[in-house]
Amino acid sequence: MVVFGLDFGTTFSSVCAYVGEELYLFKQRDSAYIPTYVFLHSDTQEVAFGYDAEVLSNDLSVRGGFYRDLKRWIGCDEENYRDYLEKLKPHYKTELLKVAQSSKSTVKLDCYSGTVPQNATLPGLIATFVKALISTASEAFKCQCTGVICSVPANYNCLQRSFTESCVNLSGYPCVYMVNEPSAAALSACSRIKGATSPVLVYDFGGGTFDVSVISALNNTFVVRASGGDMNLGGRDIDKAFVEHLYNKAQLPVNYKIDISFLKESLSKKVSFLNFPVVSEQGVRVDVLVNVSELAEVAAPFVERTIKIVKEVYEKYCSSMRLEPNVKAKLLMVGGSSYLPGLLSRLSSIPFVDECLVLPDARAAVAGGCALYSACLRNDSPMLLVDCAAHNLSISSKYCESIVCVPAGSPIPFTGVRTVNMTGSNASAVYSAALFEGDFVKCRLNKRIFFGDVVLGNVGVTGSATRTVPLTLEINVSSVGTISFSLVGPTGVKKLIGGNAAYDFSSYQLGERVVADLHKHNSDKVKLIHALTYQPFQRKKLTDGDKALFLKRLTADYRREARKFSSYDDAVLNSSELLLGRIIPKILRGSRVEKLDV
């Protein structure tokens, strides 16, 4: 029984297990970086995820719907729905709704593409993806998953953290902890930074988000001092800009559906130039010669945005620690976009960066760190990670300015209190409480996360005589970054503010779907065609009817399908299984587990 580490990403996700003092990554199609895609079959109770979902999305003979960009909708509610529509500009229909006992809304999404019109709730889609990924990984690791340590962007607010935690729990695998993505990456790089005498900046440039954290290390203890980031800045944005560049070069109307991930990765790691076929939606094709300097030029504005955030976070860290702003720091590069051409040299040129640390596998660092964190939960663990609150938590003054109760950078779990005095009050008086998350001085610019009216009689105040009543506001930040807000009366009676939880999916019926493994399906088809065409010393031909039937998509139960063929024979099929054994599945599937060196 093992706690798995999950890096739930915007573009790609990874899952890792820490077993026997070793880290292992799960692989699909010989890759540990699995697209955060879901395909829901409409005519069966099957679900495909990752690369399998991508394959099915392009097969017009398969009935169902394809979903992607799930993480980009986390945090969308009734207060910012229009902002999300403006930023994401989805071509599919969306709508707001409240799920189960949640007090705040989330979104229901129509499928991104597919052969059958479909829609599904965001919590249901995320939970389905997590369940399919973890259950398949558990089978590959040959161990039972008892819980999940999930990574989240450092810049997530408490509502986004609560939403993510609830989605993971809905999958059936309890979310035992959440770790900021840069913090998890730092933990996976512990052997490289534990001896560092200077602070370490963890630069996490992923597919959909950018995060940076400042970490100090002493032996095997890592403390997060400051964090920041941009929820709408990542490799996807560079992809979009690069697609526009390619189509302008080819003088064709832009087709945003084209996938350029292979081109970008090739230019980032392998080649300096190559020919790329640019195809319009009408099928017009133009071959374009692309070189690495073009990608670097397109990426440059996005890289500069990340560097601006790095400087702001480091300035905040130096100010809080009362250090000179030119104190030198090391910079650890993680995330898929950290391989961009020219990025290493540009980061090395930042005045306060004296060394850039490069990991053997920057993309797997977050999942590996989450799995390693399971060791931190043991009483005998030699490692300790102290994470921090990403934003100030504050109440409002009478001038609507922020009174900070939990400062950004505070270690979590954390409890902050603030005493207020209500003059001219008695048991029937009402206190209006509100808690804000954000770093602006003016409260209205921050995110209001809790609010409610409390009758003082409900917190132990008695009598009708007016007087000054001392009250205490208590803010608790849990180890997963979720928050509770309470009002405590003068005798210690406590009242939770905010009513129902923002996101509670405990009564949501996820439904039972079976993971459709295309590799098993394909290997079964190989066994079947071998059996249908086998005869001693030569191959026999299929009849036209059997050939037409075979070319149709078969269900997962290939033994049942086999009986539809006129040339089928039970004994021959059993022989084929013995002859092909485990070789064919391994060839078609590729390796499923990879050891991760840290």
Swiss-Prot record:
Organism ancestry: Viruses, Riboviria, Orthornavirae, Kitrinoviricota, Alsuviricetes
Q: GO molecular function, one example? A: ATP binding
**Any one cellular component term from GO for this entry?**
host cell plasmodesma
Q: Which SUPFAM superfamilies match?
A: Actin-like ATPase domain (SSF53067), Heat shock protein 70kD (HSP70), peptide-binding domain (SSF100920)
Asked if the Swiss-Prot or TrEMBL record annotates the protein with the keyword DNA-binding, the reply is no
Query: Which InterPro entries does the UniProt record give?
Result: ATPase_NBD, Heat_shock_70_CS, HSP70_peptide-bd_sf, Hsp_70_fam
Q: Does the keyword Signal apply?
A: no
Q: Which PROSITE patterns match?
A: HSP70_2 (PS00329), HSP70_3 (PS01036)
According to UniProt, the name of this protein is Movement protein Hsp70h
- Taxonomically, the superkingdom here is Viruses
Which BP terms from GO are recorded?
Answer: transport of virus in host, cell to cell
Functionally, this protein is described as follows: Transports viral genome to neighboring plant cells directly through plasmosdesmata, without any budding. The movement protein allows efficient cell to cell propagation, by bypassing the host cell wall barrier. Two movement proteins, p6, Hsp70h and three structural proteins, CP, CPm, and P64 are essential for cell-cell movement. Also plays a role in virion formation. Together with CPm and p64, encapsidates the 5'-terminal portion of the viral genome.
Location comes to: Virion; Host cell junction, Host plasmodesma
Give the primary localization class. virion
From the record, give the cysteines joined by S-S bonds.
none
The record's listing under Pfam families reads: HSP70
Q: How does it assemble?
A: Homomultimer. Interacts with p20. This interaction allows the docking of the latter to the virion.
